[in-house]
C-alpha cells in the first residue's frame, strides 16, 4: 500500500540565483528573437561567473540581437547593479559564441517534426488552487516574497536566495508545514538579529498560509550563519540546472530536458507545457485528484511515439477512458501544440524564475482549464469539476 502519512520537501530559488540568472538571459534572447522572427530557431545557453556573462548556442534567425546589451539589461532588472553585490550589470563583460542551427536538424523540424527525441512529463493535483503540489508552490511563494521584500524596502537584502519547504501529509492530504528554510544573500553590515526578524515578519509570515504554520513548524534562516558573497561571485550560473525548481519540486517525474533558451520546436519545452495543460485539465474536470502525463517523441517525427496517463489510484472513471479522452481532445504534434498554446509569443523570460507551472499570469496559456468540459464529455464521466478551476 502507498504511504499516506509522510513529509515531502521542495525547494525554490530567487531570480538572483546564478542558475536562474542564466535561465533568464537565455529566455530573454529567445523573446528577442520571437519578437522579430516567429520562425527563428533558438538553442541558447548562458554561463555566468564573477564579472562576466557567456552566451553560446545555435540560433538561426533574421532578427538582429544585441546580445551584450540584452544580457546586461537582464542582470540589472534582477538587481545586480553594484560591485558591492559581487556583480554589476553596468560593467560586466559579455562573451558571445553563437552559431546557426544544424541543417540536419532543420530539415526535420521545418516540416513539423519534433526538434529532438525524448520523453516529457506533465503533472497536476488538487492540493492547491493552482492545482500544483503544495511543497513547490509554497517554496515559490517564499522566494517571490523574498524578492518583493528586497524591492520594497529591505535594502540589506541581495538578489541571490533560496527557500525550502517541507509539508506534512496525513492520509495523503496536506496537513501542515513542518519546516521552512530561507537562505538569502545580504549586505555585510546587517546584523543576524535584524535579518532574521525581517525575514520572519516580511517574508515567511506573508508568504505561507497561516493555517498550515504552527508552533511546531521549524524555521531555519541562513543556517550557515552569514551569506554575504553570493550570485555569480559565489557560484557559477548555467542555463538548465534548476529543472526540478522549474517544474513540480520532485513530485511527479521529469524527462530530464531543460526549458530555458529553447524555442517551441524543441519538445523538451513545448511538450512539457502540453503535458501540464493536459494534466491540469484532467484534474480540473474532476476526472482524477492527481494526474501525470508522459509524451515521447522521435526527432523529425510529428506524432508522439507514446502517450501515457497515470492517476495514482485517484481516477473517478477508468483510467483507460481518460487516456482515450486525452487523445481525442488534445493535438500532440509539435505544430498542434505550438498553435494550440500560442507558443510563438515573446513570453519566456517571465517563465524563467519562480516556476513554469502554477502561475496565474495570462501569458501562461498552458495553465488554462478550458478543455475540462470537453475532457469530461469525452471520458463519459458524470463527475464534478474542481471548484474555481
UniProtKB/Swiss-Prot annotation:
GO terms for biological process: one-carbon metabolic process; S-adenosylmethionine biosynthetic process. It is an enzyme of class 2 (transferase). It catalyses: L-methionine + ATP + H2O = S-adenosyl-L-methionine + phosphate + diphosphate. It comes from the Bacteria. Mg(2+) binds at residue 19. Keywords: ATP-binding, Cytoplasm, Magnesium, Metal-binding, Nucleotide-binding, One-carbon metabolism, Potassium, Transferase. Its cofactor is Mg(2+); K(+). Pathway: Amino-acid biosynthesis; S-adenosyl-L-methionine biosynthesis; S-adenosyl-L-methionine from L-methionine: step 1/1. Residues 101-111 are annotated as: Flexible loop. Gene3D superfamilies: 3.30.300.10. InterPro entries: ADOMET_SYNTHASE_CS, S-AdoMet_synt_C, S-AdoMet_synt_central, S-AdoMet_synt_N, S-AdoMet_synthetase, S-AdoMet_synthetase_sfam. PROSITE patterns: ADOMET_SYNTHASE_1 (PS00376), ADOMET_SYNTHASE_2 (PS00377). GO terms for cellular component: cytoplasm. It is found in: Cytoplasm. Its main location: cytoplasm. L-methionine binds at residues 58, 101, 235, 266. GO terms for molecular function: ATP binding; magnesium ion binding; methionine adenosyltransferase activity. Its EC number is 2.5.1.6. ATP binds at residues 17, 160-162, 226-227, 235, 241-242, 258, 262. Binds 2 divalent ions per subunit. Binds 1 potassium ion per subunit. K(+) binds at residue 45. NCBIfam families: metK (TIGR01034). Homotetramer; dimer of dimers. Catalyzes the formation of S-adenosylmethionine (AdoMet) from methionine and ATP. The overall synthetic reaction is composed of two sequential steps, AdoMet formation and the subsequent tripolyphosphate hydrolysis which occurs prior to release of AdoMet from the enzyme. Belongs to the AdoMet synthase family. This is S-adenosylmethionine synthase. It comes from Anaeromyxobacter sp. (strain Fw109-5). The lineage of its organism: Bacteria, Pseudomonadati, Myxococcota, Myxococcia, Myxococcales.
Amino acid at each position: 500500500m502507498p504511504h499516506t502519512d509522510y513529509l515531502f520537501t521542495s525547494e525554490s530559488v530567487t531570480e538572483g540565483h546564478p542558475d536562474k540568472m542564466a535561465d533568464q538571459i537565455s529566455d530573454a534572447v529567445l523573446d528577442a528573437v520571437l519578437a522579430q522572427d516567429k520562425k527563428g530557431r533558438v538553442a541558447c545557453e548562458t554561463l555566468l561567473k564573477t564579472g562576466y556573462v557567456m552566451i553560446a548556442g545555435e540560433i538561426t534567425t533574421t532578427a538582429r540581437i544585441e546580445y551584450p546589451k540584452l544580457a546586461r539589461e537582464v542582470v540589472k532588472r534582477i538587481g545586480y547593479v553594484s560591485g558591492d553585490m559581487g556583480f554589476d550589470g553596468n560593467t560586466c563583460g559579455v562573451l558571445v559564441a553563437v552559431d546557426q542551427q544544424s541543417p540536419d536538424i532543420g530539415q526535420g523540424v521545418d516540416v513539423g517534426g519534433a526538434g529532438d527525441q525524448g520523453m516529457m512529463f506533465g503533472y497536476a493535483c488538487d492540493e492547491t488552487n493552482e492545482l500544483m503540489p503544495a511543497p513547490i508552490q509554497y517554496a515559490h511563494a517564499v522566494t517571490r516574497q523574498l524578492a518583493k521584500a528586497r524591492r520594497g524596502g529591505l535594502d540589506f537584502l541581495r538578489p541571490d536566495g533560496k527557500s525550502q519547504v517541507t509539508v506534512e501529509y496525513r492520509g495523503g492530504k496536506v496537513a501542515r508545514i513542518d519546516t521552512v528554510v530561507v537562505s538569502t544573500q545580504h549586505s555585510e553590515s546587517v546584523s543576524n538579529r535584524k535579518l532574521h526578524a525581517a525575514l520572519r515578519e516580511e517574508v515567511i509570515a506573508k508568504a505561507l498560509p497561516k493555517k498550515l504554520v504552527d508552533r511546531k513548524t521549524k524555521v531555519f534562516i541562513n543556517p550557515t550563519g552569514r551569506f554575504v558573497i553570493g550570485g555569480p561571485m559565489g557560484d557559477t550560473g548555467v542555463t538548465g540546472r534548476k529543472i526540478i525548481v522549474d517544474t513540480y519540486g520532485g513530485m511527479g517525474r521529469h524527462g530530464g530536458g531543460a526549458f530555458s533558451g529553447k524555442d517551441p520546436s524543441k519538445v523538451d519545452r513545448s511538450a512539457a507545457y502540453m503535458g501540464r495543460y493536459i494534466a491540469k485539465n484532467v484534474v480540473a474536470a474532476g476526472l482524477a485528484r492527481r494526474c501525470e502525463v508522459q509524451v515521447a517523441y522521435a526527432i523529425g517525427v510529428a506524432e508522439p511515439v507514446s502517450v501515457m496517463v497515470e492517476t495514482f489510484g485517484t481516477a473517478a472513471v477508468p483510467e483507460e477512458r481518460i487516456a482515450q479522452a486525452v487523445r481525442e481532445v488534445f493535438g500532440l504534434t509539435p505544430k498542434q501544440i505550438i498553435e494550440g498554446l500560442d507558443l510563438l509569443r515573446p513570453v519566456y523570460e517571465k517563465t524563467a524564475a519562480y516556476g513554469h507551472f502554477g502561475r496565474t499570469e495570462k501569458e501562461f496559456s498552458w495553465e488554462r482549464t478550458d478543455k475540462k468540459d470537453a475532457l469530461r464529455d469525452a471520458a463519459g464521466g458524470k463527475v464534478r469539476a474542481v471548484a474555481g478551476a
